[in-house]
Amino acid sequence: MAGNAYSDEVLGATNWLKEKSNQEVFSFVFKNENVQLNGKDIGWNSYKKELQEDELKSLQRGAETTWDQSEDMEWETTVDEMTKKFGTLTIHDTEKYASQPELCTNSTCIGSRGPGFRALEHTKYSCCGHCRNPEHWGSWFQSLPRWSTEPNLVRDRGGFESVLRCGTVEERLQRAAELGLRYDGASS
């Protein structure tokens, strides 16, 4: 219906222009004695035309493929960078950073510095294992193998990511022990 109404409006305007074309004022504006209008009714589907040339089609396909690949590569690059960053972080590093005064709050084993800035809470439930307070250590820390000839590497990507998802250092060490990762006990 909308197409028919549009066509009727176009025909009405064309007929009006043809009727008025013989009048003196109208012909003076167009500076032409005999005005002829030629038109074509254009529908919405006429605006998207398929390309006729094979070369242009291949260029379009190539551009679309390149765009898709660039988006995929950006995503993969970001994931690979994150994995590399996590790969360099060992279990010992997480303990070392968790035991730093600026990373702990409400700590009784760090000293008299008081509460720090960061969000990690240092209690007997989330102890770093290096503090001077043995009651914070618990049996889980002593049960971990402390000597290993193997380097502190991760066997699979998913296991290490699950270790990093754990909230506290204690949970990380427990998860690492479940996965068979070794804690070498070295301090730097």
From Swiss-Prot:
UniProt key word Protein transport: no
Transmembrane segments: none
BP terms from Gene Ontology: exit of virus from host cell nucleus through nuclear pore
Signal sequence bounds: none
Cellular-component GO terms for this entry: host cell nucleus
Cellular compartment(s): Host nucleus
Keywords of this entry: Host nucleus
Quaternary state and interactors: Interacts with host SNRPN. Interacts with host XPO1.
Function of the molecule: Plays an essential role in viral protein synthesis. Plays also a role in active nuclear export of mature particles before host cell lysis, by interacting with host XPO1.
This protein's name: Non-structural protein NS2
Organism the protein comes from: Murine minute virus (strain MVM prototype) (MVM)
